[in-house]
Amino acid sequence: MPAHLRTGIAGEDAAFFELRRKGYTVVARRWSAGTLDGDVDLIAWQGPMLCFIEVKTRTARDRTPAEAAVDRHKQYVLRGLARAYIRHLPQGDPPPTRFDVISVYLVPGEKREFMHFENAFGWN
């Protein structure tokens, strides 16, 4: 497996455990609708709020923060995936939702760092 994929998986794993530590209930990892491009890294409940979470991982610090990689196109893809996921929920009013981004820094020789951006972008 290429190094960048191993790094991404390590970051998603770290974010998963950090969310659980914070009391989230993670219900899906790397969820894909099958027909749409991409996947949602983590889907979790924080109380009544359904959170669609994109994780960006870096092993070095550069000028551009990791969360900046969630550009307009990625946001568009995540919105489509969220709609598909919500359609699979039991009938009734859709739950309140939000889109979060978690930046994970796994820099050798440094303590692991998380930056959690709740409600990083919306439905529009």
Regions found by a protein language model. Give the residues of each.
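Conserved catalytic cores of phosphodiester-cleaving nucleases, focusing on short active-site segments
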Residues: 40-63, 78
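Short, low-complexity, polybasic intrinsically disordered segments
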Residues: 104-124
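Hydrophobic residues on conserved beta-strands that form the core of alpha/beta folds
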Residues: 26-28, 52, 99
